[in-house]
Protein backbone atom coordinates (compact mmCIF):
# COMPACT_ATOMS: atom_id res chain seq x y z
CA UNK A 1 0.00 0.00 0.00
CA UNK A 2 1.03 3.58 -0.67
CA UNK A 3 1.91 5.62 2.38
CA UNK A 4 -0.78 8.19 3.33
CA UNK A 5 1.88 10.87 3.71
CA UNK A 6 2.96 10.27 0.11
CA UNK A 7 -0.66 10.48 -1.07
CA UNK A 8 -1.21 13.79 0.71
CA UNK A 9 2.04 15.15 -0.70
CA UNK A 10 0.93 14.30 -4.23
CA UNK A 11 -2.53 15.79 -3.61
CA UNK A 12 -0.92 19.00 -2.39
CA UNK A 13 1.48 19.07 -5.33
CA UNK A 14 -1.40 18.68 -7.81
CA UNK A 15 -3.64 21.10 -5.94
CA UNK A 16 -6.33 18.48 -5.30
CA UNK A 17 -6.53 19.32 -1.59
CA UNK A 18 -7.96 22.77 -2.30
CA UNK A 19 -11.71 23.53 -2.52
CA UNK A 20 -13.41 22.62 -5.80
CA UNK A 21 -14.29 26.25 -6.51
CA UNK A 22 -10.66 27.29 -6.13
CA UNK A 23 -9.52 24.45 -8.38
CA UNK A 24 -12.07 25.50 -11.01
CA UNK A 25 -11.01 29.15 -10.89
CA UNK A 26 -7.36 28.13 -11.19
CA UNK A 27 -8.25 25.97 -14.19
CA UNK A 28 -10.04 28.91 -15.85
CA UNK A 29 -7.03 31.13 -15.21
CA UNK A 30 -4.73 28.53 -16.78
CA UNK A 31 -7.12 28.21 -19.73
CA UNK A 32 -6.97 31.96 -20.36
CA UNK A 33 -3.19 31.65 -20.49
CA UNK A 34 -3.43 28.59 -22.79
CA UNK A 35 -2.06 26.30 -20.13
CA UNK A 36 -4.10 23.12 -19.70
CA UNK A 37 -1.41 21.30 -17.76
CA UNK A 38 0.18 17.93 -18.42
CA UNK A 39 -1.26 14.46 -18.71
CA UNK A 40 -1.26 12.39 -15.53
CA UNK A 41 -0.31 9.31 -17.59
CA UNK A 42 2.72 10.35 -19.65
CA UNK A 43 3.28 13.96 -18.47
CA UNK A 44 2.87 15.29 -22.02
CA UNK A 45 1.47 18.77 -22.65
CA UNK A 46 -2.31 18.49 -22.93
CA UNK A 47 -2.42 20.96 -25.82
CA UNK A 48 -0.13 18.69 -27.84
CA UNK A 49 -2.28 15.66 -27.06
CA UNK A 50 -5.54 17.42 -27.94
CA UNK A 51 -3.98 19.02 -31.03
CA UNK A 52 -2.99 15.67 -32.52
CA UNK A 53 -6.36 14.18 -31.58
CA UNK A 54 -8.21 17.14 -33.10
CA UNK A 55 -6.42 16.56 -36.40
CA UNK A 56 -7.62 12.95 -36.49
CA UNK A 57 -11.22 13.86 -35.64
CA UNK A 58 -11.24 16.74 -38.15
CA UNK A 59 -10.09 14.41 -40.94
CA UNK A 60 -12.83 11.91 -40.11
CA UNK A 61 -15.57 14.53 -39.86
CA UNK A 62 -14.54 16.45 -43.00
CA UNK A 63 -14.35 13.27 -45.08
CA UNK A 64 -17.68 12.17 -43.63
CA UNK A 65 -19.16 15.58 -44.53
CA UNK A 66 -18.06 15.19 -48.16
CA UNK A 67 -19.53 11.69 -48.32
CA UNK A 68 -22.78 12.89 -46.74
CA UNK A 69 -23.09 15.85 -49.11
CA UNK A 70 -22.46 13.83 -52.28
CA UNK A 71 -24.52 10.85 -51.13
CA UNK A 72 -27.45 12.99 -49.97
CA UNK A 73 -27.58 14.89 -53.28
CA UNK A 74 -27.73 11.65 -55.25
CA UNK A 75 -30.19 9.95 -52.88
CA UNK A 76 -32.43 13.02 -52.59
CA UNK A 77 -32.75 13.31 -56.36
CA UNK A 78 -33.43 9.59 -56.77
CA UNK A 79 -36.01 9.57 -53.97
CA UNK A 80 -37.95 12.33 -55.69
CA UNK A 81 -37.66 11.02 -59.27
CA UNK A 82 -38.63 7.46 -58.28
CA UNK A 83 -41.22 8.37 -55.63
CA UNK A 84 -44.12 6.83 -57.60
CA UNK A 85 -42.60 3.44 -58.44
CA UNK A 86 -41.26 0.38 -56.64
CA UNK A 87 -37.65 1.59 -56.71
CA UNK A 88 -38.68 4.72 -54.83
CA UNK A 89 -40.45 2.68 -52.16
CA UNK A 90 -37.37 0.48 -51.72
CA UNK A 91 -35.10 3.53 -51.48
CA UNK A 92 -37.41 5.17 -48.93
CA UNK A 93 -37.47 2.01 -46.79
CA UNK A 94 -33.68 1.63 -47.04
CA UNK A 95 -33.24 5.26 -45.98
CA UNK A 96 -35.37 4.78 -42.87
CA UNK A 97 -33.45 1.60 -42.05
CA UNK A 98 -30.09 3.36 -42.52
CA UNK A 99 -31.10 6.15 -40.13
CA UNK A 100 -32.07 3.56 -37.52
CA UNK A 101 -28.80 1.57 -37.60
CA UNK A 102 -26.34 2.64 -34.86
CA UNK A 103 -22.87 3.72 -35.94
CA UNK A 104 -21.15 1.12 -33.73
CA UNK A 105 -23.10 -1.68 -35.47
CA UNK A 106 -22.15 -0.34 -38.89
CA UNK A 107 -18.50 -0.12 -37.84
CA UNK A 108 -18.30 -3.65 -36.44
CA UNK A 109 -20.21 -5.03 -39.44
CA UNK A 110 -17.86 -3.19 -41.80
CA UNK A 111 -14.83 -4.79 -40.16
CA UNK A 112 -16.43 -8.24 -40.13
CA UNK A 113 -17.86 -8.26 -43.66
CA UNK A 114 -15.96 -5.79 -45.85
CA UNK A 115 -12.52 -6.14 -44.26
CA UNK A 116 -12.35 -9.72 -42.91
CA UNK A 117 -14.71 -11.76 -45.11
CA UNK A 118 -14.51 -9.91 -48.42
CA UNK A 119 -11.01 -8.48 -47.87
CA UNK A 120 -11.89 -5.37 -49.90
CA UNK A 121 -10.65 -2.59 -47.62
CA UNK A 122 -8.12 -3.01 -44.82
CA UNK A 123 -8.90 -1.20 -41.57
CA UNK A 124 -5.28 -1.12 -40.40
CA UNK A 125 -1.99 -0.05 -41.92
CA UNK A 126 -3.59 2.43 -44.32
CA UNK A 127 -2.22 5.90 -45.03
CA UNK A 128 -3.73 9.11 -46.33
CA UNK A 129 -7.50 9.29 -46.83
CA UNK A 130 -7.81 5.50 -46.84
CA UNK A 131 -6.87 5.57 -43.16
CA UNK A 132 -10.02 7.54 -42.36
CA UNK A 133 -12.39 6.24 -45.07
CA UNK A 134 -13.91 3.27 -43.16
CA UNK A 135 -14.69 5.39 -40.08
CA UNK A 136 -15.96 8.31 -42.17
CA UNK A 137 -18.17 6.01 -44.23
CA UNK A 138 -19.76 4.42 -41.16
CA UNK A 139 -20.31 7.88 -39.69
CA UNK A 140 -21.84 9.14 -42.95
CA UNK A 141 -24.44 6.44 -43.63
CA UNK A 142 -27.09 7.84 -41.30
CA UNK A 143 -26.45 11.39 -42.49
CA UNK A 144 -26.78 10.40 -46.15
CA UNK A 145 -30.15 8.79 -45.46
CA UNK A 146 -31.38 11.67 -43.28
CA UNK A 147 -30.35 14.48 -45.62
CA UNK A 148 -31.44 12.48 -48.67
CA UNK A 149 -34.98 12.38 -47.32
CA UNK A 150 -34.80 16.05 -46.35
CA UNK A 151 -33.60 17.02 -49.82
CA UNK A 152 -36.33 14.93 -51.45
CA UNK A 153 -39.02 16.80 -49.53
CA UNK A 154 -37.34 20.14 -50.25
CA UNK A 155 -37.16 19.28 -53.97
CA UNK A 156 -40.87 18.46 -53.93
CA UNK A 157 -41.61 21.90 -52.51
CA UNK A 158 -39.26 23.59 -54.98
CA UNK A 159 -40.99 21.89 -57.91
CA UNK A 160 -44.02 24.12 -57.29
CA UNK A 161 -42.00 27.29 -57.97
CA UNK A 162 -42.76 29.45 -61.01
CA UNK A 163 -39.31 28.82 -62.48
CA UNK A 164 -40.07 25.09 -62.58
CA UNK A 165 -43.41 25.75 -64.30
CA UNK A 166 -41.67 27.81 -66.98
CA UNK A 167 -39.06 25.08 -67.42
CA UNK A 168 -41.78 22.50 -67.97
CA UNK A 169 -43.44 24.76 -70.51
CA UNK A 170 -40.14 24.75 -72.41
CA UNK A 171 -40.34 20.96 -72.60
CA UNK A 172 -37.41 20.21 -70.28
CA UNK A 173 -37.26 16.76 -68.67
CA UNK A 174 -37.93 16.21 -64.96
CA UNK A 175 -34.36 15.02 -64.17
CA UNK A 176 -32.92 18.16 -65.78
CA UNK A 177 -35.41 20.41 -63.97
CA UNK A 178 -34.58 18.76 -60.64
CA UNK A 179 -30.83 19.22 -61.09
CA UNK A 180 -30.95 22.68 -62.68
CA UNK A 181 -33.79 24.41 -60.81
CA UNK A 182 -35.14 22.47 -57.83
CA UNK A 183 -31.92 21.09 -56.33
CA UNK A 184 -30.26 24.50 -55.69
CA UNK A 185 -33.36 25.69 -53.80
CA UNK A 186 -33.47 22.45 -51.82
CA UNK A 187 -29.79 22.74 -50.89
CA UNK A 188 -30.33 26.26 -49.53
CA UNK A 189 -33.00 25.02 -47.11
CA UNK A 190 -30.87 22.13 -45.80
CA UNK A 191 -27.45 23.82 -45.40
CA UNK A 192 -28.07 25.15 -41.84
CA UNK A 193 -29.19 21.72 -40.60
CA UNK A 194 -26.20 20.15 -42.33
CA UNK A 195 -23.81 22.46 -40.46
CA UNK A 196 -25.43 21.61 -37.13
CA UNK A 197 -25.12 17.91 -37.95
CA UNK A 198 -21.38 18.31 -38.53
CA UNK A 199 -21.01 19.55 -34.97
CA UNK A 200 -22.90 16.51 -33.74
CA UNK A 201 -20.66 14.28 -35.87
CA UNK A 202 -17.59 15.63 -34.06
CA UNK A 203 -19.13 14.67 -30.74
CA UNK A 204 -20.46 11.35 -32.07
CA UNK A 205 -17.23 10.23 -33.70
CA UNK A 206 -15.99 8.72 -30.42
CA UNK A 207 -17.60 5.35 -31.16
CA UNK A 208 -16.10 4.82 -34.60
CA UNK A 209 -12.74 6.22 -33.49
CA UNK A 210 -12.49 3.58 -30.79
CA UNK A 211 -13.66 0.75 -33.04
CA UNK A 212 -11.17 1.65 -35.79
CA UNK A 213 -8.44 2.64 -33.27
CA UNK A 214 -8.09 6.19 -34.57
CA UNK A 215 -6.64 8.46 -31.84
CA UNK A 216 -9.14 11.30 -32.21
CA UNK A 217 -10.87 13.36 -29.52
CA UNK A 218 -13.44 10.68 -28.75
CA UNK A 219 -10.76 8.02 -28.52
CA UNK A 220 -8.79 10.23 -26.13
CA UNK A 221 -11.85 10.83 -23.96
CA UNK A 222 -12.52 7.11 -23.53
CA UNK A 223 -8.87 6.34 -22.74
CA UNK A 224 -8.61 9.29 -20.36
CA UNK A 225 -11.75 8.21 -18.51
CA UNK A 226 -10.28 4.73 -18.15
CA UNK A 227 -7.00 6.14 -16.82
CA UNK A 228 -8.68 8.97 -14.85
CA UNK A 229 -6.50 11.45 -16.70
CA UNK A 230 -8.43 14.57 -15.66
CA UNK A 231 -6.47 17.26 -17.59
CA UNK A 232 -6.99 15.42 -20.88
CA UNK A 233 -10.67 14.81 -20.10
CA UNK A 234 -11.26 18.49 -19.37
CA UNK A 235 -9.45 19.61 -22.52
CA UNK A 236 -11.11 17.18 -24.95
CA UNK A 237 -14.61 17.88 -23.62
CA UNK A 238 -13.87 21.61 -23.83
CA UNK A 239 -12.76 21.36 -27.45
CA UNK A 240 -15.79 19.26 -28.42
CA UNK A 241 -18.14 21.75 -26.75
CA UNK A 242 -16.35 24.60 -28.50
CA UNK A 243 -16.72 22.82 -31.85
CA UNK A 244 -20.47 22.35 -31.28
CA UNK A 245 -20.85 26.06 -30.49
CA UNK A 246 -18.84 27.08 -33.58
CA UNK A 247 -20.87 24.85 -35.91
CA UNK A 248 -24.15 26.15 -34.45
CA UNK A 249 -22.98 29.75 -34.90
CA UNK A 250 -21.98 29.00 -38.50
CA UNK A 251 -25.38 27.41 -39.10
CA UNK A 252 -27.15 30.54 -37.81
CA UNK A 253 -24.94 32.84 -39.91
CA UNK A 254 -25.48 30.79 -43.06
CA UNK A 255 -29.22 30.65 -42.46
CA UNK A 256 -29.39 34.45 -42.09
CA UNK A 257 -27.31 34.97 -45.22
CA UNK A 258 -29.49 32.60 -47.22
CA UNK A 259 -32.68 34.21 -45.94
CA UNK A 260 -31.30 37.64 -46.90
CA UNK A 261 -30.40 36.35 -50.36
CA UNK A 262 -33.83 34.81 -50.88
CA UNK A 263 -35.48 37.99 -49.64
CA UNK A 264 -33.43 40.01 -52.11
CA UNK A 265 -34.53 37.76 -54.92
Predicted regions and their residues:
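Generic structural marker for isolated residues within well-ordered, non-membrane alpha-helices
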Residues: 7, 25, 94, 251
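Coil-to-alpha-helix initiation sites in intrinsically disordered, low-complexity, charged segments
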Residues: 5, 15, 19-27, 45, ...
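Alpha-helical transmembrane segments of integral membrane proteins
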Residues: 50-87, 103, 127-265
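An internal, D/E-rich "acidic patch" concept
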Residues: 17-73
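Hydrophobic alpha-helical transmembrane segments of membrane transport/permease proteins
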Residues: 1-22, 114, 118-134
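Membrane-water interface segments at the C-terminal ends of transmembrane alpha-helices
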Residues: 29, 93-122, 138-142, 149
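A short secondary-structure junction motif
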Residues: 31-35, 117, 201, 214
Amino acid sequence: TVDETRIEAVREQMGLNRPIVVQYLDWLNDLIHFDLGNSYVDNRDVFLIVGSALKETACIVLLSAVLQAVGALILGGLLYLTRKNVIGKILAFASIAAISIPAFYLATSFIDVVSVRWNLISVSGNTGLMRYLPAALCLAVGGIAFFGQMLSKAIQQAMSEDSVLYARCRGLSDPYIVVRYAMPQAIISTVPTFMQMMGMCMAGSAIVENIFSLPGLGYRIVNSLTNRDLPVIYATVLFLAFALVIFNILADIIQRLLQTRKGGL
